[in-house]
A protein has these predicted regions:
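IMPase-like, lithium-sensitive Mg2+-dependent phosphomonoesterase catalytic core
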Residues: 1-34, 56-290
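N-terminal, Lys/Arg-enriched amphipathic/low-complexity engagement segments
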Residues: 39-64
């Protein structure tokens, strides 16, 4: 893989992680392809979810590989209660080993989300994020100074494009239970669909955000506090912001950046809106003051 796009203080650790993923992505795909990979275990993870077999196997595989990197001090999976920490290193990884596992049995797109933090697990310390999506093809998207998209072919990641969102998109990925939506959100969604926006929600956050990114605009929303800040929300918020979009939530009717949220406990959850500028403006118009 050509690493010419990666420059600056945190480029080296991103390159190390990508190199590791490039070597291990076929093994990860093999884990997902096993006939019983989507079977549920009898366990409950720290977030209260029941993992499938592939969650646990992929988690162990990724943890071992991340810990092998000299510059990584701590590795933290959403499947674990607390981080695994080493003596040396300055970077911390928080990751969701298999986002979208609940729809994997339907053969929907799933993926691994990775957040790279410096010194502490805080939104303000997030320096880069990556995700790999697994489907009929494998893709990698990286956010550092900009957002870069790669396709996996013949054992290597090949550059596809730099992703920049347009001011206005055409797709909406609206998650959550609609009966619990606020009146403002319902009106905003009705307005979008009246303008011929297309609904593209699969139940896999990484897949839906990936769709918004590669289509160069639109909106992903999950108004209930279900998504985990460290493992899902912050990494994908950084991704959207670096692509010239907006990542936000509403606090008593006031729009605020997701990446300015505090983290009181490791598995804390948040509502989440990721959008192009136009969609963000419309949402603020309808949800302001609610």
């Amino acid at each position: 893989m050509d690493y010419k796009h990666f420059k600056g203080k945190h480029a080296n650790i991103v390159i190390e992680i990508i190199s590791l993923l490039e070597k291990g992505v076929k093994k990860a795909q093999e884990i997902l392809e096993k006939p019983d990979a989507g079977s549920y275990t009898k366990l409950e993870n720290s977030s209260g979810d029941t993992p499938i077999k592939a969650d646990l196997v992929l988690d162990k595989f990724l943890e071992e590989n991340f810990l092998s990197l000299e510059n990584i001090k701590s590795v933290f999976s959403e499947e674990k209660e607390t981080p695994v920490t080493k003596e040396n290193g300055s970077y911390l990884i928080a990751y969701d080993p298999l986002d979208g596992s609940s729809v994997m049995e339907a053969n929907f797109l799933v993926g691994t989300i990775i957040g790279v933090y410096e010194k502490d697990y805080k939104a303000q310390n997030l320096v880069a994020s990556l995700y790999v999506v697994f489907g009929h093809k494998i893709e990698l998207v990286v956010a550092l100074d900009k957002v870069y998209r790669y396709g996996f072919y013949q054992n290597k990641f090949h550059f596809i494009e730099t992703i920049v969102l347009e001011n206005k998109g055409k797709i909406i990925a609206s998650g959550g239970n609609q009966k619990d939506f606020s009146s403002g959100l319902k009106k905003a969604l009705e307005g979008f669909f009246a303008e011929n926006y297309r609904l593209r929600y699969s139940g896999s956050m990484v897949a839906d955000v990936h769709h918004v990114l590669i289509k160069k605009g639109g909106m992903f929303s999950y108004p209930q506090k279900k998504l985990r800040k460290l493992f899902e929300v912050f990494p994908l918020a950084l991704m959207v912001e670096k692509a010239k979009g907006e990542a936000f939530y509403f606090d008593k009717g006031v729009k605020k950046r997701l990446l300015e949220q505090s983290v009181e406990n490791y598995h804390e959850k948040s509502e989440c809106y990721l959008a192009s500028p136009h969609e963000a403006q419309i949402l603020e118009k309808y949800l302001k003051g609610e």
